[in-house]
Curated annotation (Swiss-Prot):
Subunit structure of this chain's protein: Homotrimer.
Domain of life the protein comes from: Bacteria
Gene Ontology molecular function, alphabetical: porin activity
Membrane topology (UniProt): Multi-pass membrane protein
Protein name as annotated: Major outer membrane protein P.IB
Signal sequence bounds: 1-19
Amino acid sequence: MKKSLIALTLAALPVAAMADVTLYGTIKAGVETSRSVEHNGGQVVSVETGTGIVDLGSKIGFKGQEDLGNGLKAIWQVEQKASIAGTDSGWGNRQSFIGLKGGFGKLRVGRLNSVLKDTGDINPWDSKSDYLGVNKIAEPEARLISVRYDSPEFAGLSGSVQYALNDNAGKYNSESYHAGFNYKNGGFFVQYGGAYKRHVRVDENVNIEKYQIHRLVSGYDNDALHASVAVQQQDAKLVEDNYSHNSQTEVAATLAYRFGNVTPRVSYAHGFKGSFDDADLSNDYDQVVVGAEYDFSKRTSALVSAGWLQEGKGENKFVSTAGGVGLRHKF
């Protein structure tokens, strides 16, 4: 009897040690097909098509916390991509951090979602293709090696500030500053996210200074209905062209409604013509994505979507269409 009790106690020790550690993740994959046509001077100059089995953003993570007393907790998370196609490698390549949480809010350091990325509910699509999600407006979203503070919620209002150091931004990029707020009242919500960088290297021949971005999202979200609209504005100075002024404004909207196990969804995004040295650019675009999810259970869902994107107008434009089906399981 005594030996059995000792054996049972020893067997329970690893379980007790892991009690505050959570394993979680999502496996999602599917088949996507696309066709892109480029027009120049009214003539078709290129046509590209493709169909393939793709990973839709699978991930696996570990997270936990320790009670330090007096309402203070240590928190941590290690999350990484987990492509079923075997194309991902490394640890902590998604949101991964260590920090403290208490009545003062939450303070974390590591690879963290930018404040702007946390306003990304406007793009809820699971896709690999840029044509099956409103990815144009989502391009500035990122995960940054940074320090971030999130305040506690007061009467539905909370705020965040974030700082990414110069040495973590890359050789030709400066430090960046980020801030935002969230307001919730019943199902209604308002979100703001913004960022500023002194200088950024876009590519070898394009450098910009005084880059700033602002996004405002508002909508309604409950168990059945989700409706949101967003407006985003970017502004910068182009170094190679005598610090000319560059800016673009984009808008997007998403509507979804749950009918039993089925959730149909539609998104629309529009990019207005950008300003480049006081001249209009042909970088305007329109994008539409429609689709639906069917829930087999709380964890497993089937996905289907179709998308259309047009950049430019008239004789010079780029038009793409795409479709996809997939399966998603959460654990």
